[in-house]
Amino acid sequence: MTDSALDRTLVARHLRFQTNGRYLTDDVSLELNCGEIVAIIGPNGAGKSTLLRLLTGYLTPDDGECLLAGQPFSHWQPSALAKTRAVMRQHSGMAFAFSVQDVVAMGRSPHGRYPKNDDVVQQVMAQTGCLELATRDYRHLSGGEQQRVQLARVLAQLWHPEPTPGWLFLDEPTSALDLYHQQHLLRLLKQLTREQPLAVCCVLHDLNLAALYADRILLLHEGKLVAQGSPADVLQAETLAHWYRADLSVGSHPDYAIPQVYLRQ
């Protein structure tokens, strides 16, 4: 891998993480490249959120290594890492009263006194449909509104005046969103990965959303990476029925050459 390619890649090798004698992540190796969306799927308890925490540096593996742009997380200065890697957790509550605009502006804190911070906040709020929420108390928003605000925050965190490699990690970002906002969020992420050197890695339970928007899919089961590849490679009826233990079928999307998953009654 060339130096320029290395600068745009996160590499995980043989990651293992255990607790109470049980491996939550077991010998997982993968790459996340700028310019793509990667979806992590799998049944409940598969280890999806644990893997995400290992890939972001919030957990240290018992074995294996994770290199962001060629460097282990321990070699990164916190301020530089915060401007390169952003994480949207599954639940992001606030104990105190902050306006939506204040929450989004928190994403700019690693950038110090950049003169256009306010402009960046307005831009990402517009992109995520949060402008009309700007003065609202974050604590009083619906779950879906809070998810949109948190997306704006992490986009603000990774915004740079010049194209700069970045990695965005999202844990179930569509779980509280209605259909319109699911589509809007994932279309926005797709657009950003095409326009910027940005890698997006997200945990998704909706397999059809993963098929529509992900460039690659990683299927986990009991901490192991049991399948990876394009949506067509991974979302096959036999594979999904085996690992999800569900009665299902897989067909084709009416408009695109991608699979769609259907549950049987």
Swiss-Prot record:
Gene3D superfamilies: P-loop containing nucleotide triphosphate hydrolases. It is a peripheral membrane protein. Keywords: ATP-binding, Cell inner membrane, Cell membrane, Membrane, Nucleotide-binding, Translocase, Transport. InterPro entries: AAA+_ATPase, ABC_transporter-like_ATP-bd, ABC_transporter-like_CS, P-loop_NTPase. Its main location: membrane. It holds the Pfam family ABC_tran. ATP binds at residues 42-49. Its EC number is 7.6.2.-. PROSITE patterns: ABC_TRANSPORTER_1, ABC_TRANSPORTER_2, HMUV. It is found in: Cell inner membrane. SUPFAM superfamilies: P-loop containing nucleoside triphosphate hydrolases (SSF52540). One of its GO terms (molecular function) is ATP binding. One of its GO terms (cellular component) is plasma membrane. Residues 10-247 form the ABC transporter domain. PANTHER family: HEMIN IMPORT ATP-BINDING PROTEIN HMUV. Part of the ABC transporter complex HmuTUV involved in hemin import. Responsible for energy coupling to the transport system. Belongs to the ABC transporter superfamily. Heme (hemin) importer (TC 3.A.1.14.5) family. The complex is composed of two ATP-binding proteins (HmuV), two transmembrane proteins (HmuU) and a solute-binding protein (HmuT). This is Hemin import ATP-binding protein HmuV. It comes from Pectobacterium atrosepticum (strain SCRI 1043 / ATCC BAA-672). The lineage of its organism: Bacteria, Pseudomonadati, Pseudomonadota, Gammaproteobacteria, Enterobacterales. The gene is hmuV.
